[in-house]
Amino acid sequence: MSEQLLTASTSIDAAPLSDNTVQTTAPATSKINLLDLNRQQMREFFAEMGEKPFRADQVMKWMYHYCYDDFEQMTDINKGLRAKLQRVAEIRAPEVAEEQRSVDGTIKWAIKVGDQQVETVYIPEADRATLCVSSQVGCALECKFCSTAQQGFNRNLRVSEIIGQVWRAAKIIGSLKSTGTRPITNVVMMGMGEPLLNLNNVVPAMDIMMDDFGFGLSKRRVTLSTSGVVPALDKLGDMIDVALAISLHAPTDDIRDEIVPINRKYNIETFLAAVRRYLDKSKANGGRVTVEYVMLDHINDSTEQAHQLAECLKDTPCKINLIPWNPFPGAPYGRSSNSRVDRFSKVLMEYGFTTIVRKTRGDDIDAACGQLAGEVIDRTKRTLKKKMAGEPIAIKTV
């Protein structure tokens, strides 16, 4: 597959795996939003109109290679087909409600999805530019150190609302090309929500990201991050091949049960076994998974816990990202000191693990890892205010 740069030239039970039901809002119009369709679906739609498959490919190229949303601008499409498309279809990406820019070049967009908002973050670096994309409005998993989790869960995003974040960002970044802004080269499903609880929408969206007539990204440049929804992870391996990152954050079940509550349903051993099964099928990961580990002061950052983590991961090929915790209002944690992070990292490297301390980006605009919140109407009725008033959070110190 050729790789094109992106430019404009609840509890777990509250958010099911979406095997049979996709939680969405109703479309704003009766027209088909072509951003909801991957290439196979697009060709089927065009066939229903009596058109040949290559016409669908042509339209996709205009949509994703050039970020056009007006059929009249698609000059190699005949006028009759353009008129037909105007009657029955549209290209409607979610709009930007607010944009914030960090001193380090990071850009955060609040994206309107119905009457709510999710957040999308553009992170430029010397050799790449990564877009962090949301998959749900809120999140049901209640990870205690994450701002999104404190908003509760409302619904899954549609395909058009997921790929639409990439489309909108690519269009904006393309317009900034003259300023030297780096085109998007990587997409990570690490924004608001648990992607594996929205497989029916996340998988087609990632398919479009990697399609030659879509955004044309390599499978190694599209990453899905999960906290450990094991049945859905097994299903993912049969549906698509992308890079995998896992939100581990603790070396033992007693700590992970507290800070990542889904661990009470799928413990570390069960989770890592599923990860190894995925790696056995995947070519996108180069044989190893990325382990994400947020550093919480005196919670999970002792040298003893570093040894425990090394033991925990000894049978799982991986590289480890140590993430400085990013604070949000009302959170009961502190960021690990540089000295504790350094000691933790050195222990892991002594065991032979590739270990990276992630540089915090966009924290001045609350765009850093764990800080995304958006605007969520909480269908699970779990808000930070209620938690702090009626459900004290148990914390172990080490």
From Swiss-Prot:
Q: Which UniProt keywords apply?
A: 4Fe-4S, Cytoplasm, Disulfide bond, Iron, Iron-sulfur, Metal-binding, Methyltransferase, rRNA processing, S-adenosyl-L-methionine, Transferase, tRNA processing
Occurrences of domain Radical SAM core (ranges): 125-364
| Entries under CDD domains matching the protein | Radical_SAM
Q: Quick one: where is this thing mainly located?
A: cytoplasm
Statement: the UniProt record of this protein carries the keyword Methyltransferase: yes
Q: Which GO terms describe its biological process?
A: rRNA base methylation; tRNA methylation
Active site per UniProt: 119 (proton acceptor), 369 (s-methylcysteine intermediate)
Q: Which PROSITE patterns match?
A: RADICAL_SAM
Instruction: Give compartment(s).
Output: Cytoplasm
One annotated GO molecular function is: metal ion binding
Enzyme Commission code(s) on record: 2.1.1.192
Residues annotated as binding S-adenosyl-L-methionine are: 193-194, 225, 247-249, 326
Which Pfam family, any one of them, does this sequence belong to? RlmN_N
Q: Which NCBIfam families does this chain map to?
A: PRK11194.1, rRNA_mod_RlmN
Q: What does this protein do?
A: Specifically methylates position 2 of adenine 2503 in 23S rRNA and position 2 of adenine 37 in tRNAs. m2A2503 modification seems to play a crucial role in the proofreading step occurring at the peptidyl transferase center and thus would serve to optimize ribosomal fidelity.
Q: What is this protein called?
A: Dual-specificity RNA methyltransferase RlmN
Recall the taxonomic lineage recorded for the source organism: Bacteria, Pseudomonadati, Pseudomonadota, Gammaproteobacteria, Enterobacterales
